[in-house]
């Protein structure tokens, strides 16, 4: 009876090794494995998404000597058209409103050339490759066969070790 137990355990170990060698450990992504991502140096700036719990957020920043307030009861306001004079600070007051959809509403004098609305941008707010610099493909994208070979060897080693332990255990039972 012990001899038959050893044969059954050996057959299970052989079946486990064969099944693991036949199927790859991970399925390679054929689209990225055959065509690595192209390098890019495009700089894209996106606005952050509004908090899900708030309907709108308003932020006001004040700069310049007017921030402390006038002492004689009068207030002077520099032009808010984006121009700068020698005596007036840059846009003493700038207000930006952020709605729940993530769109930014700039005021006059605010540079909006690099703002992108989250509602029109596809994907996450900072997609891969949109950062400054050169993007490189992941190691798993360009060479998945090396990962599969290593993982397959690891599974084979583990199956042999498991079969050995089971065989020795069955012998002493």
From Swiss-Prot:
Q: Which UniProt keywords apply?
A: Sporulation
Mark out the compositionally biased spans (Polar residues): 95-133
Q: Where is the composition biased (Low complexity)?
A: 22-89, 134-155
Q: In which tissues is it expressed?
A: Germinating spores.
Q: Does the keyword Cytoplasm apply?
A: no
Ranges where the record places region Disordered: 22-155
**GO terms (BP aspect):** sporulation resulting in formation of a cellular spore
What role does this protein play?
Could be a structural protein required for the infection process of B.lactucae.
UniProt name for this protein: HAM34 protein
- In the UniProt record, the gene name given for this protein reads HAM34
């Amino acid at each position: 009876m012990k001899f038959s137990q050893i044969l059954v355990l050996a057959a299970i170990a052989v079946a486990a090794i064969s099944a693991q060698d036949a199927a790859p450990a991970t399925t390679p992504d054929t689209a990225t494995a055959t065509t690595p991502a192209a390098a890019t140096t495009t700089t894209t700036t996106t606005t952050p998404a509004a908090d899900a719990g708030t309907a709108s957020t308003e932020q006001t920043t004040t700069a310049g000597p007017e921030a402390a307030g006038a002492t004689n009861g009068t207030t002077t306001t520099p032009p808010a058209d984006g121009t700068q004079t020698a005596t007036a600070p840059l846009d003493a007051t700038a207000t930006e409103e952020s709605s729940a959809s993530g769109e930014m509403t700039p005021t006059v004098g605010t540079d909006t050339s690099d703002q992108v609305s989250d509602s029109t941008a596809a994907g996450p707010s900072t997609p891969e490759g949109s950062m400054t610099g050169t993007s490189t493909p992941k190691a798993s994208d360009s060479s998945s066969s090396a990962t599969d070979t290593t993982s397959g060897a690891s599974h084979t080693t583990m199956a042999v070790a498991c079969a050995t332990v089971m065989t020795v255990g069955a012998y002493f039972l």
